[in-house]
């Protein structure tokens, strides 16, 4: 929630009248983002969850999970390099989603989306909670 996509996305979600609870998760800096967002007067209550030890608490009872996690593609980095790093991040997050919020709508922004979404689907299938109407890849062409 504290990266280049997660932070502005958190701001937009905080401002939405459809959001009552906004649970932010990251491996660094998330408490500062949550503190900044808490100063915005909306109905959404913001909580911060830092590191793998707080992931289950963050996801428990979630209706919607948005995953912008991972490294951005850097100059000289191949899509294979990007995949090797980001696939394991998505796999860990989806595994926790399957256990803690199996009925949540899951939106994956992590690149390469055409590879991370199928990985997520397979993990959800392994946990017997896969619903193709609840898993989305969110992307744009650049």
Swiss-Prot record:
<keyword id="KW-0496">Mitochondrion</keyword>
<feature type="binding site">
    <location>
        <position position="111"/>
    </location>
    <ligand>
        <name>substrate</name>
    </ligand>
</feature>
<feature type="binding site">
    <location>
        <begin position="109"/>
        <end position="111"/>
    </location>
    <ligand>
        <name>NAD(+)</name>
    </ligand>
</feature>
<keyword id="KW-0520">NAD</keyword>
<feature type="binding site">
    <location>
        <position position="73"/>
    </location>
    <ligand>
        <name>substrate</name>
    </ligand>
</feature>
<dbReference type="GO" id="GO:0006099">
    <property type="term" value="P:tricarboxylic acid cycle"/>
</dbReference>
<comment type="similarity">
    <text>Belongs to the LDH/MDH superfamily. MDH type 1 family.</text>
</comment>
<dbReference type="InterPro" id="IPR036291">
    <property type="entry name" value="NAD(P)-bd_dom_sf"/>
</dbReference>
<feature type="binding site">
    <location>
        <position position="86"/>
    </location>
    <ligand>
        <name>NAD(+)</name>
    </ligand>
</feature>
<comment type="subunit">
    <text>Homodimer.</text>
</comment>
<dbReference type="Pfam" id="PF00056">
    <property type="entry name" value="Ldh_1_N"/>
</dbReference>
<dbReference type="GO" id="GO:0030060">
    <property type="term" value="F:L-malate dehydrogenase (NAD+) activity"/>
</dbReference>
<feature type="binding site">
    <location>
        <begin position="1"/>
        <end position="6"/>
    </location>
    <ligand>
        <name>NAD(+)</name>
    </ligand>
</feature>
<feature type="binding site">
    <location>
        <position position="26"/>
    </location>
    <ligand>
        <name>NAD(+)</name>
    </ligand>
</feature>
<dbReference type="GO" id="GO:0005759">
    <property type="term" value="C:mitochondrial matrix"/>
</dbReference>
<feature type="binding site">
    <location>
        <position position="79"/>
    </location>
    <ligand>
        <name>substrate</name>
    </ligand>
</feature>
<dbReference type="InterPro" id="IPR001236">
    <property type="entry name" value="Lactate/malate_DH_N"/>
</dbReference>
<keyword id="KW-0560">Oxidoreductase</keyword>
<protein>
    <recommendedName>
        <fullName>Malate dehydrogenase, mitochondrial</fullName>
        <ecNumber>1.1.1.37</ecNumber>
    </recommendedName>
</protein>
<keyword id="KW-0816">Tricarboxylic acid cycle</keyword>
């Amino acid at each position: 929630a504290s990266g280049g996509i997660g932070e502005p996305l958190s701001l937009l979600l905080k401002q939405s009248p459809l959001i009552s609870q906004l649970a932010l998760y990251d491996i660094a800096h998330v408490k500062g983002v949550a503190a900044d967002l808490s100063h915005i007067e909306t109905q959404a209550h913001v909580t911060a969850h830092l590191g793998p030890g707080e992931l289950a608490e963050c996801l428990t009872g979630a209706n919607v999970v948005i995953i912008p996690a991972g490294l951005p593609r850097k100059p000289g980095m191949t899509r294979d390099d990007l995949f090797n790093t980001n696939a394991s991040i998505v796999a860990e997050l989806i595994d926790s989603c399957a256990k803690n919020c199996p009925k949540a709508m899951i939106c994956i922004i992590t690149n390469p989306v055409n590879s991370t979404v199928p990985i997520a689907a397979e993990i959800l299938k392994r946990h017997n909670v896969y619903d193709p109407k609840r898993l989305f890849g969110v992307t744009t062409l650049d």
